[in-house]
A protein has these predicted regions:
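All-alpha amphipathic helical-bundle segments outside canonical DNA-binding/catalytic cores
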Residues: 268-277
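Phosphate/pyrophosphate-binding loops and the adjoining catalytic core of nucleotide-dependent enzymes
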Residues: 2-13, 17-18, 92-108, 228-236, ...
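Active-site activation/catalytic loop segments of kinase-like enzymes and analogous catalytic loops
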Residues: 191, 199-262, 278-293
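Conserved kinase catalytic-core helix
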Residues: 42, 47, 72-160, 166-167, ...
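Active-site acidic catalytic loop and adjacent metal/ATP-binding pocket
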Residues: 150-211
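ATP-binding glycine-rich loop module of kinase domains
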Residues: 3-41, 48, 56, 64-65, ...
Length: 316
């Protein structure tokens, strides 16, 4: 069976060099350099060893081959007891909070304004470039929904200096590996972070591991509360029942619901997690152009999260 570490995105290629090494390559040299530098600098995160960075028309680096599964595969298929999975979530959240307690260098405060691109600016730019009319209104399960512009405007995510941290930057379940010798009593030695962002999200793409710690937690929420991995696995689907009307079918299991409740109990029931998730789903729609069904489901799911947010945090 192909090791699940080897799943790659369309802009990367991953090949097996030997039983202990894989090679990740891309035409995006800056991305390869940024990832490699993150691995070199961020020893606080357990990650595979990397070496042999090569920069050229096709840039690459070699990485220790971790035999195991992604957290996404474990979650989708419920491969470990739910109590153990919740313990893993606690470990990751504690890692994020521990990193936040490490003060970033004073000169890195300059990155704060650039990080704002992560949210409303990126969402608006991607959707308009893809051809969305942000003034269109939608229906979800027969419920009237405001326009995407109104939704985006209500999903404010502010960043101040206390939010700056040394982050992973793309902390989704598919970028977290659990090796085959997993021991819930010793998670640190069996959990590995891969595919960090390593650069600013705006057009400058300046290489840095500084980011908004809330974004890392929001990416976890995107998998747990937002059901991203279940959508990718075709376990949650939406039907388009009109030009801008959807029916969303959500049949999450008790296992998933326990993990959701545990996340909220640990990370807090905060509106900002919903705001980040909504931005993530909307901004990802153009990136899934190869699968219109996933695009419909992601849009419908963003509308679902908006309704949940309104019901949870509506001003009394």
């Amino acid at each position: 069976m192909l090791n699940l570490m080897l799943a790659s995105r369309y802009f990367n290629s991953i090949i097996i060099v030997n039983d202990s090494t894989i090679r990740k390559a891309s035409k995006d040299s800056k991305k390869m350099i940024a990832e490699y530098r993150w691995f070199q600098e961020r020893d606080e995160y357990n990650h595979p060893n990397v070496y042999n960075l090569q920069v050229g028309d096709i840039s690459s680096y070699d990485m220790e081959y971790i035999h195991g599964r992604t957290l996404s595969d474990i979650y989708v298929n419920e491969l470990i007891p739910v109590e153990d999975f919740c313990t893993i979530i606690d470990f990751i959240l504690n890692k994020i909070i521990t990193m936040r307690k490490q003060s970033v260098k004073y000169e890195d405060y300059r990155f704060r304004e650039s990080l704002n691109f992560l949210y409303a600016e990126k969402t608006t730019e991607r959707l308009t470039n893809y051809g969305f009319n942000l003034n269109w209104k939608y229906k979800l399960n027969e419920i009237e929904i405001p326009s995407l512009k109104e939704i985006i405007d209500t999903c404010e995510v502010s960043i101040d200096n206390t939010d700056l941290s040394y982050v992973h930057g793309d902390l989704c379940f598919s970028n977290i590996l659990i090796d085959d010798n997993f021991d819930v009593n010793n998670i640190e030695d069996h959990l590995y972070f891969i595919d960090p962002r390593g650069m600013l999200p705006n057009k400058s793409k300046e290489i840095t591991s500084v980011g908004d710690y809330k974004y890392d937690i929001g990416k976890l929420a995107h998998s747990i509360i937002g059901n991203y991995d279940l959508i990718k696995a075709n376990l949650i689907k939406a039907d388009k029942v009109g030009e801008r009307s959807f029916t969303l079918y959500d049949e999450t299991t008790q296992y998933k619901n326990i993990v959701k409740e545990h996340f909220f109990a640990t990370a807090g029931h905060k509106e900002v997690w919903y705001n980040i998730m909504i931005h993530l789903f909307l901004s990802m729609i153009p990136l899934h152009d190869d699968n219109p069904k996933h695009q419909d489901t992601m849009l419908a799911n963003a509308l679902r999260l908006y309704l949940e947010k309104v019901n949870l945090f509506r001003k009394k």
